[in-house]
């Protein structure tokens, strides 16, 4: 899980999700692409 000020989709399988007011990127194909805005 990377914590970044600016989260971006890294590959075409990445999805932007807002959970509890926090923007996250989840990726089912490459778990290393997980990010959270912080």
Curated annotation (Swiss-Prot):
Pfam families, A to Z: Ribosomal_L36
InterPro entries, per the entry: Ribosomal_bL36 (IPR000473), Ribosomal_bL36_sp (IPR035977)
Keyword Ribonucleoprotein belongs to the record: yes
Protein origin, superkingdom: Bacteria
GO MF annotations in UniProt: structural constituent of ribosome
GO biological process per UniProt: translation
Gene Ontology CC terms: cytoplasm; ribonucleoprotein complex; ribosome
Keyword line: Ribonucleoprotein, Ribosomal protein
Residue ranges that the Swiss-Prot or TrEMBL entry lists as coiled coil: none
Homology family: Belongs to the bacterial ribosomal protein bL36 family.
UniProt-listed HAMAP family: Ribosomal_bL36
Name of protein: Large ribosomal subunit protein bL36
Encoding gene (name): rpmJ
């Amino acid at each position: 899980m990377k914590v970044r000020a600016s989260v971006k989709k890294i590959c075409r399988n990445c999805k932007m999700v807002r959970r509890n007011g926090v923007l996250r990127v989840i990726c089912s194909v490459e778990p290393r692409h997980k990010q959270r805005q912080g």
